């Protein structure tokens, strides 16, 4: 999915509070491993580059802003669809709903202002989230909730919350 890196930017900044760094030794072993698949090796080097940059700079405000623009573009489309239908592909739950529920959950717990910007998406999300089957899948252990709260507080104090970095 073309938004994998973008959700990673949001999650690493707002959900994991600086956790998720790789040891330099482990990263070096991963970097030096060569497979017989050159395409896989290219993807691996992209991962290595991400973790090296993350170790030095964290997730930059510019990276978050670029990711938010991409998500807003997608949610603009979903908002229009959800004015006339219950789910993203129509009136029946689809794999698209399942995939976007996970993305939306990560953004929701990170402080994305769904209710203000995308009320139909917010209703769609909360309708799914209120169902036990969905809630059980994303209900994080207490330690992750505490880490997330720490990340939200520190980014808000530093004026680096999602709301502060949203595209104008």
Which residues make up each language-model segment?
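Long, positively charged, glycine-interspersed low-complexity recognition regions
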Residues: 117, 122-168
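GST-like fold's C-terminal all-alpha helical module
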Residues: 2-130
């Amino acid at each position: 999915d073309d938004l994998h890196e973008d959700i990673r930017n949001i999650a690493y900044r707002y959900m994991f509070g600086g956790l998720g760094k790789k040891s330099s030794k482990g990263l070096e072993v991963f970097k030096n491993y060569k497979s017989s698949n050159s395409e896989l090796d290219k993807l691996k080097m992209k991962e290595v580059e991400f973790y090296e940059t993350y170790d030095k700079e964290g997730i930059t405000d510019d990276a978050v802003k670029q990711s938010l623009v991409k998500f807003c573009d997608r949610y603009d489309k979903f908002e229009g669809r959800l004015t006339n239908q219950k789910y993203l592909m129509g009136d029946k739950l689809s794999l698209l709903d399942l995939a976007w529920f996970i993305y939306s959950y990560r953004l929701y717990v990170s402080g994305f202002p769904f209710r203000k910007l995308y009320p139909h998406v917010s209703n769609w999300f909360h309708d799914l989230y209120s169902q036990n089957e969905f809630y059980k899948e994303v209900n994080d252990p207490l330690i992750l909730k505490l880490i997330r709260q720490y990340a939200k507080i520190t980014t808000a104090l530093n004026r680096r919350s999602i709301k502060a970095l949203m595209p104008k």
